[in-house]
Amino acid sequence: MAIQAQKGTKDMLPNDAYKWHYIEEKLRKISAEYGIREIRTPMFEATELFKRGVGETTDVVQKEMYTFEDKGGRSITLKPEGTAPAVRAFIENSLYADAQPTKMFYFTPCFRYEKMQKGRLREFHQYGIEVFGSQEASIDAEILSLVMRALTEDFGIKGLSLNINSLGCPKCRAKFNEALKQYLKENYDNLCETCKTRFEKNPMRIIDCKEKRCKEIVKEAPSILDYICEECSDHFSKLKAYLDVMGIEYNIDPQIVRGLDYYSKTVFEVIKDGLTVCGGGRYDYLVEEVDGPKTPAMGFGLGLERLLLILDEEGIEIPEPVRCEVYIGSMGDNAKLEAMKLAFNLRKAGIKAEIDHLGKSVKAQMKYANKIGAKYTFVIGDSEIEENKIKIKRMSDGEQFEVSLDINEIVNIVK
């Protein structure tokens, strides 16, 4: 049996690569508009980073990570998300010593061993933003404005819902967790086994459980917004005011807790037809948790596979770039030499040029040129070389003409 791609992975073929380039270019552009610069972190990290950063009781750490021991006996994990590695890089490279806030974005593959679903594979790709050094609600609103602008204006997606919540600070959550435990007590026996463990260690994680029975139980659970302190409530009010002044619509959803333990205060999700397009929030204690200085932070992740799926389902076309501007057909060895020289010079002038590498007949060459969408076809033979001329056909209307083999004249025609 032939070796195949592993379950949960997918090849990105040349016919699809331009779609990825398109969305990455759009996201790079809007990142630059907000003064956000790129970071690249390794594909694998110490397992301890994710245990401490993401949270021991999360599904990600308990069930989904690709973890192995390397030849040096170190526990290594393929990164399941982008925030913890960005935090590690922020600390290790002393970026906290720079002028704050520090704004960074990334494109990264992530790996999670989870049940595959629409738009989600075991190897998937994320665009993420992390902002360090500001505790102000204004930075949260700024990042949310970027998200909604990118999705609605740059990509033209309709029917999106921005849902926000506040998880408060550790003191708020302690009060909420007690109230939540009191509520869950009478349904304890109906919880899944994982949530029974969470009941004592981290009851708020039960709200994020994907099991149907647990989802039903938490529908009427207390709202954390009834337990946040005055400072956290003020932060949430300011966030809403900033969103209002920018004209960004939102819904308040007290059941958004996100699947990772590091979140505090603001959390959000962008929903389309019941699926989460992207999500994130504030994590003011994570940098300190992984041995850095006390640093407030905010970030989010956007799944690129899911984004491409939505664009396809919405019928939003991604413009396909011209693959070949000039195809140079040749007859004979001398003509092939001239074709090679001409293609080289056209490429130097920034023109996409192709020649025959299979020894095809001129008819077959022209058929191939049409198949790859060449805008112009050239034909060179011995007579053209002797007369220092070349035959050109404009494929859009079929017009044919002869011009000198002078590269400057040819460039002026096809550009």
From Swiss-Prot:
Pfam families for the chain: HGTP_anticodon, tRNA-synt_His
UniProt keywords, alphabetically: Aminoacyl-tRNA synthetase, ATP-binding, Cytoplasm, Ligase, Nucleotide-binding, Protein biosynthesis
Broad enzyme group: ligase
Entries under InterPro entries matching the protein: aa-tRNA-synth_II, aa-tRNA-synth_II/BPL/LPL, Anticodon-bd, Anticodon-bd_dom_sf, His-tRNA-ligase, HisRS-like_core, HisRS/HisZ, HisRS_anticodon
UniProt GO molecular function: ATP binding; catalytic activity, acting on a protein; histidine-tRNA ligase activity; transferase activity
Source organism superkingdom: Bacteria
Location(s) in or outside the cell: Cytoplasm
Enzyme Commission identifier(s): 6.1.1.21
GO CC annotation, single: cytoplasm
GO terms of biological process kind: histidyl-tRNA aminoacylation
Catalysed conversion reaction: tRNA(His) + L-histidine + ATP = L-histidyl-tRNA(His) + AMP + diphosphate + H(+)
Oligomeric form and interacting partners: Homodimer.
Similarity comment: family membership: Belongs to the class-II aminoacyl-tRNA synthetase family.
Stated name of the protein: Histidine--tRNA ligase
Species in which this protein is naturally found: Clostridium perfringens (strain ATCC 13124 / DSM 756 / JCM 1290 / NCIMB 6125 / NCTC 8237 / Type A)
Lineage summary: Bacteria, Bacillati, Bacillota, Clostridia, Eubacteriales
